[in-house]
From Swiss-Prot:
Residues 1-89, 309-465 are annotated as: Disordered. Coiled coil: none annotated. Pfam families: OGFr_N (PF04664). Belongs to the opioid growth factor receptor family. Residues 442-465 have a biased composition (Polar residues). This is Opioid growth factor receptor-like protein 1.
Length: 465
């Protein structure tokens, strides 16, 4: 009974987050080829993030849980609580998360508890033995029970035989599947044919019909009556969970997503079976081993779930800001700072060059004024300066001149004539901005040169030394 593998201990998950790896990564792995019976073996197996935990060798009964998965009083209370919740925000069930975690991980650390020749489930599906305790063969169930909704509703011992699992259910006469039995079952066409007929029978009981060999489903003819019954008989949600698990065990993993998508659509979009939405999101979705398929279904559900703020099965909120930060911080701040640095460097270089230019011009001008006799050129405007003033200048030079003349003017010598070039207060104060503007104006340089040449002409004493 549930013998542990020698020397290996399985660490039980302790939180819902430990059990659920659906949103651990957004990378979508490449799809793989489906298994031989259209399902589970070829698809991406769920949650390989814990390689140190070996998969179960075969499907023995899981370690004793507080309550068996199929127990109506325990699991039914969780799966059937939708109608009483109203608008209250739902909560994730640790019991459900742990149970489905073990299922998706092939029941780790447990060995087969039966001999390989004890193929009770396969022999039942080969019509060799009846299911216990009722003593009914599979052919009678498929032929006489089909459409008898009262019998299918009130009998609680057949479902474990029709959809066997590697875990104990409510009917203790039913035998758990083993790994060897699963492989033999898939090889037996007779068993597979009857298994699909049993699946169709139960779908019709729920008001659903299988429409093709890929697992797509649609509403049955009597869907309105059966949906109303399904919405009110919440113990059938346990049966749907078991059916989904069994599909995955016996090679029809690919049949799960179409059925779950259909149920989510009817519950959230059409509102025909609203009471099932909690079980669909908490149980049905998480029977699917492929993370990609789970993400697709949960995104669809989130789009239609109301109120949207009560949807608790999406990606964790703490991961979203981290991704947005990583996307927003490539190189923009670095470029901005580099741009500012280069601008400052350019302005500093221009200020330094303009300051040096003005110092040289100022030194020449002071020497010139010092050598000049007081009042000598008071009434003699420079012809060169006059001719220079008469030349047309472009608008840029005018703007530069206006800006340089905007502060109050101060001449070096109060007796200087109109022909002398004005020296602004910015030249005396040495402010960088106006100095850089003056250094860029070619008129100031030419004006100083003209004054020097004029001084040499009008003051022969100075020129002669």
């Amino acid at each position: 009974m549930g013998n542990l593998l020698g020397g290996v201990s399985f660490r039980e998950p302790t939180t819902v987050e430990d059990c659920d790896s659906t949103w651990q990564t957004d990378s979508e792995p490449e799809p793989e080829q489906p298994g031989p019976a259209g399902g589970g073996e070829g698809q991406e197996q769920d949650e390989r993030e814990q390689p140190e935990q070996p998969p179960e060798r075969a499907g023995g009964r899981p370690r004793a849980s507080p309550v068996p998965e199929d127990h109506a009083e325990a699991a039914g209370a969780e799966q059937g609580g939708d109608s009483t919740e109203g608008n209250a925000k739902p909560k994730r069930s640790f019991y459900a998360a742990r149970d489905l975690y073990k299922y998706r991980h092939q029941y780790p650390n447990f060995k087969d508890i039966r001999y390989q020749n004890d193929l009770s489930n396969l022999r039942f599906y080969k019509n060799k033995i009846p299911f216990k305790p009722d003593g009914v063969y599979i052919e009678e169930v498929l032929n006489k029970w089909k459409g008898d909704y009262e019998k299918l509703e009130h009998n609680h011992t057949y479902i474990q035989w029709l959809f066997p699992l590697r875990e104990q259910g409510l009917n203790f006469y039913a035998k758990e599947l083993t790994t060897y039995e699963i492989e033999e079952f898939k090889k037996t066409k007779e068993a597979i044919r009857r298994f699909l007929l049993a699946y169709k029978m139960m779908l019709e009981f729920f008001g659903i019909k299988l429409i093709d060999k890929t697992g797509n489903v649609a509403r049955a003819v009597n869907w309105q009556e059966r949906f109303q019954h399904l919405n009110e008989s919440q113990h059938n949600y346990l049966r749907i969970t078991r059916i989904l698990k069994s599909l995955g065990e016996l090679g029809y993993e690919s049949f799960k997503s179409p059925l779950v998508k259909f149920i989510l659509h009817e519950a959230l979009v059409e509102n025909t079976i609203p009471n099932i939405k909690q079980s669909a999101l908490e149980y049905f979705v998480y029977t699917i081993r492929d993370r990609r398929e789970r993400r697709k279904l949960l995104r669809f559900a989130q789009k239609h779930y109301t109120p949207s703020e009560n949807f608790i099965w999406g990606p964790p909120k703490k991961e979203q800001p981290e991704r947005s930060k990583a996307q927003k911080t490539p190189t923009l701040p670095a470029l901005g700072s580099n741009g500012q640095t280069s601008t400052h460097k350019k302005s500093k270089d221009s200020k330094n060059s303009s300051a040096a230019s003005h110092l040289n011009n100022k030194t020449v001008e002071e020497k010139k004024v010092a050598s000049r006799e007081p009042g000598e050129e008071t009434d003699k405007p420079s012809p060169e300066a006059s001719s220079e003033d008469t030349k047309p200048r472009n608008s840029e030079d005018d703007n530069a001149a206006d800006q340089s003349e905007s502060p109050p003017k101060k001449t070096v010598n109060d007796s200087a004539g109109k022909g002398e070039c004005p020296t602004t207060s910015s030249e005396k104060d040495g402010e960088g901005e106006n100095q850089s503007k003056d250094s860029e104006n070619p008129e100031n340089t030419s004006c100083h040169a003209e004054v020097v040449s004029q001084q040499n002409v009008t003051n022969p004493q100075t020129s002669s030394g």
